[in-house]
A protein has these predicted regions:
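Extended, solvent-exposed segments with strong compositional bias
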Residues: 47-60, 120-166, 179-182
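Sec-dependent signal peptide recognition
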Residues: 1-7
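C-terminal edge strands of extracellular/lumenal beta-sandwich accessory domains
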Residues: 35-36, 74, 150, 159-216
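Non-catalytic, beta-strand-enriched accessory regions in extracellular/secretory proteins
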Residues: 54-74, 79-81
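Compositionally biased, proline/threonine/alanine/serine-rich low-complexity intrinsically disordered stretches
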Residues: 8-10, 14-39, 211-216
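Short amphipathic, basic-aromatic surface patches that mediate peripheral association
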Residues: 80-102
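Short coil-to-beta strand junction motifs in C2/discoidin
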Residues: 95-108, 191-193
Length: 216
């Protein structure tokens, strides 16, 4: 039996006895997520918060994405994540607060659209105002105390939207604002009317491959 085993070993080529398994290909490098603050095109800026120093942008009602709040999306692999804070807009009156007639309940709806007017998602913020403590901040650039404007953001809803791969820019447009007050309820949808306010816009994405150089 031993002689047979030796004979079989001799019959196998030496290269087969010493052949190594093929080397495994190294795994592709993991591309880290990148987070940036995009250069937002805001047609109707509200202003900068006096306390927070945050920039606020009004989102107007409309139907044409080119006229909305434009947010460029860098080249990305897979979906990109767009995040921002969504606020309602309140016209502050100290007299109404003192008279206990300032109560307002706001429900604002905006759309996030591609530039060919395809709806990606909607975002909603609902909040109530009773006194000045319900304001997120006062905004500079007005004639009020400390240079504050009469209008101010109230309520905050953190929004996160997934932007499909291939989209290079999105637009935010207002859809509808519902306002409930002591004297009744009203709905606003007409184009050009402020619907909501955004702040703290950010993007998180996995960078896409660099563009190929044209062959000469």
């Amino acid at each position: 039996m031993r002689a047979i085993v030796v004979a079989l070993l001799l019959a196998v080529p030496l290269s087969a006895q010493t052949r190594k398994p093929p080397a495994r290909k190294p795994a592709p490098p993991v591309v880290a997520l990148k987070k940036v603050v995009p250069e937002v095109t805001c047609p109707t800026p509200l202003g900068v918060g006096l306390k927070t120093k945050v920039t606020y942008c009004e989102v107007m009602a409309g139907r044409d994405p080119a006229g909305g709040v434009l947010i460029p999306i860098p080249s990305h692999k897979g979906p990109a994540t767009l995040s921002f804070d969504l606020h309602n807009l309140h016209l502050y009156s100290e007299e109404q607060v003192r008279a206990k007639r300032a109560f307002s309940r706001y429900t604002a709806t905006i759309g996030v659209l591609t530039m060919d007017n395809t709806l990606i998602s909607r975002a909603i913020v609902q909040s109530e105002f009773r006194t000045a403590v319900d304001l997120v901040d006062r905004v500079g650039g007005g004639a009020g105390p400390g240079g504050a404007k009469a209008v101010a953001p109230t309520g905050t809803e953190p929004i996160t939207i997934s932007i499909p791969e291939g989209e290079e820019q999105v637009s935010l447009l207002g859809e509808k604002l519902m306002v409930e007050r002591i004297d009744g309820t009203a709905a606003y949808t007409q184009a050009g009317r402020p619907i909501a306010v955004i702040s703290n816009v950010a993007l998180e994405y996995k960078p896409g491959p660099p563009p190929r150089k044209p062959k000469r």
